[in-house]
Amino acid sequence: MNDSSEGFGFANQDDIENIIKIMSNGYYKCWDREFFLDLIKNRNSFLYVQRKEKSVIGFIAGKRSEEDCDIIMLIIDIKNRGEGLGSLLLSNTLLVLKDMRVKNIYLEVAVNNSSAISLYEKYGFKKINIRKSYYKFNKTMIDAVLYRMVNS
């Protein structure tokens, strides 16, 4: 893995403002700078970015224990969606987690996010539970689907 100006790599402190901008452009609840700094500094967390022409155009974040990992967000900038970059970001992250010997990978997604659900199922994530009224979008409660993948 690299932290160069192109492709997949570690996020650094200078990337945080772009990450927050990507979140806010996508109408996601934004976490603050300290949250992302903790992901970078904590050895049991990760924050990887996808760069294009030296700019951060997407990111994936998670927390892990010895054998388990929770992917807490994967977001591609709105203007770069549909280019396969989410797939690239996820596949690179799964390779890193495999190298770390992470066995179980969990994530949750809003039940109405069909593009994300298709992506996760394409990579072998299996639906294991539904969390009723988990997300709130524009005063509407949305269920979350909990997924698990066994990384072999």
List each model region and its residues.
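Short aromatic/hydrophobic contact patches that present stacked aromatics
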Residues: M73-I75, Y106-E108, L146
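C-terminal "cap" of GNAT-fold acetyltransferases
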Residues: A110-S114, S133-S152
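Conserved glycine-rich acetyl-CoA-binding loop
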Residues: D77-S91, M100, N104, A110-S118, ...
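Active-site-proximal loop/hinge segments that shape catalytic or ion-binding/gating pockets
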Residues: S5
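Short low-complexity, flexible loop/linker segments enriched in glycine and/or proline
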Residues: L47, E121-K122, D143-V145
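Acetyl-CoA-dependent GNAT
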Residues: N2, F10-K79, L90-N92, V96, ...
